[in-house]
Amino acid sequence: RRVLFRSEKIINSAQSIGFKNISCDIMIGLSGQSIEKLKLTIHKIAELSIQHFSAYILKIEENTPFNTPDIINSLPDDDHISDLYLFMAEELQKLGYNQYEISNFSKMGFESKHNLKYWKCQEYIGLGPSAHSYFNGKRYFIPSDLNKYLNSTETILTDENPGSDDEKIMLGLRLTEGININDFPSRKALFLEKAKVFNKFNLIEIKNNFIKLTPKGFLVSNSIINEFI
């Protein structure tokens, strides 16, 4: 509750000085997190007229201070995490937030244009040290060293042929709109065959030549996507 109160103050302050498009992150799979607590968080933030939510499942990485037996053992199991995710997706939909990607929900017209460029394999330009760009059909990387950046125009070509079919499939299946199998004519029959198997388990929806993951499918997206690339 203290965190919610702090977040509310920050959001109200941002709105008071003119910020109208605000995104909030939600963590799922926290120690002691119940559906009731998650519902409270979602509704409290929604009451603040937030336009965009990003929701992430907690993952404890190796070699971090959080990777201890006490913390690991306090976390919910996979079944409870699945219940939390599916509840969140349904609850946000009821509140008018459309899920457009595995971890992202928004009011109509407030989808992240920045991230959609990556997921749809569209071109973008990055500026400054460590920046990456996808421009004129090629990907570029600017070195991270500030002095080299200031004293040189050097860029490093990282990929001369980006936007492969596998990349489009991998990224496209992260989106709720999915992929159009007509865009992959040589794999169309195979895709339909695989999709029908997943459809039986309510993991994939097949509609108008599009294959798209369901909320349940998003929970095992890596395994499903690997079957298509």
Language-model regions, residue ranges each:
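C-terminal scaffold of the Radical SAM
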Residues: 1-185
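A short, conserved structural fragment
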Residues: 101, 199-209
